[in-house]
Amino acid sequence: CPFPMIRRRGRGAGLFRAPDVLERLLAAGCDEMGPGRFSLKTRLGLERTDELLALMPRINRYPLAVLTVHARTAHQMYTGVCDLAAFASVAAASTNPVMYNGDWAAGDVPPAPRVMVGRSFIRSLGAREDVDGLLGRYIDLSCAELCGDHPVLGRMKELISYWTEIPRWRRLWPLVKICRTVEELRGILKGSACGA
């Protein structure tokens, strides 16, 4: 976690300042869950993008299911450019499977075989030409999985909230935000189909 309040307490990205604590955490997780079942998600560093690379000899002592690396520092939070060269150095140094996390959009060539889908990918879906079909299918799947309109609407509203920088969705967002049923949502979406 890159948030200052968390890292000041020595948690999340604050573990970059406490490598012995990080190592105890890895040991406990791997011991408790068994080899290859515990995962670590981290940043490239707290302030610099070479800090994780310096910790790789310690991290490599533990058989992780996956090492997920957000290719920014904690200090950057979610702004600035991801450092793909630093990510590649960490991936090359790792004895565990590595998953990329950071800026990545639909259609981009992934910087690693494994990619954690995050906000930037989800945002890019809203601009796709086939978004109406995808969203309709997602509503259907959510209705089959969840019980009632309220949780389905919550899921859809969260998804659509990521798309409000796109003109169509910015225009629809006030209507989507206040709709109370799945059928009402479907009506809003149908009325705006074809990029209207």
Feature locations, PLM:
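Glycine-rich tight-turn/loop motif centered on a GG-T
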Residues: 3-22, 75-84
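Active-site beta-loop-alpha junctions enriched in small/polar residues
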Residues: 1-2, 41-47, 72-74, 101-107, ...
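Alpha/beta catalytic cores of nucleotide-metabolism and tRNA/nucleoside-modifying enzymes
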Residues: 20, 24-33, 37, 52-66, ...
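Active-site mouth loops of central-metabolism enzymes
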Residues: 14-16, 39-52
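Short connector loops/turns at beta-strand edges and beta->alpha or beta->beta junctions
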Residues: 1-4, 67
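Short glycine/serine/threonine-biased micro-segments
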Residues: 10-12, 43, 100-101, 116
